[in-house]
Amino acid sequence: MSLLTPLGLFLLLTVLTHAQAPSPFPWPEGEKLTYLIEWGPIDAAEATFTARPEPKRDGIERFELFLRSRGPIEAFFPIRTRITSLTQLHPWRTTEYIQDRNEGGNIRHRRTLPDYSVRLGRFFPAPGRTEENFDILEGPYEDFGSMLYHVRAYPWKKGSAVTWQVIENKEPLFAKISCSQVARLEIDDRPPLPLIEIFGQPHGPSSRHPGWMKIWMTDDARRIPIFAQLKFQYGTFDIRLIRGGGPELDYRPDGEPIPIYSETESSPKP
């Protein structure tokens, strides 16, 4: 299983509740947030999320996630993966999901396009390969590039919960997302902050993919996720914001910014 599949729960994890995002959205145009992904004592990867309007397509937002390996993972299983989600904001639903993966030398380019008018998914497994079609259920879909932003935009209250449909390749999945707390919380050796605690896990038929995700994001206009924990078959991962939140939110264990390796690469795209 790719690290990116459970990470989609960060990014997050039949829409039973038709979620309407508040306006304006929490992120500014061009926002970039970078996270350090730790596997026990190992710096395993860094993940950078960006958001900006899609040119010449009114109402469509381009969400991108760039995942790059770090530390010993870089030595034996280098990762350069970019996930792109073209998401319609009103109503919220994915319109195109693009995966450019380079993981341990395995290079893949995949595209998934849901056609809501006929409840059909179109999956393109690789350039030059035949298109594969599959049925989708009624209602909007998320993808692993858009979920983190929908979690940020949703009007959470303590105890509220939603079930979202998630599209991955040609497999419709389900994720149940709930709000555990809205309070001043002390997490990750930080002073108490006003935070929203979110819990996500596979739901229904998707429960065959075991795991869960907890996200803590600021309870303010920015709704910035600052810390998360991810549990899946390979263990538990800690995910810390290291760039984009400002000095008061970025994780700086020695008082200095943690270097972002992808910024020093001449060609970050896979």
What are the roles of these predicted feature ranges?
Residues 11-13, 24, 136:
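Generic alpha-helical structural signal
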Residues 108-151:
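Hydrophobic, well-structured mid-protein blocks that either form specific transmembrane helices
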Residues 5-15:
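Bacterial N-terminal signal peptides
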Residues 6-8, 30, 144, 212:
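Hydrophobic alpha-helical segments and their boundary regions
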Residues 13, 39, 131-134:
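Intrinsically disordered, low-complexity regions
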Residues 20-116, 153-270:
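Acidic, serine/threonine-rich low-complexity disordered tracts
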Residues 1-2:
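N-terminal secretory signal peptides that target proteins for export/translocation
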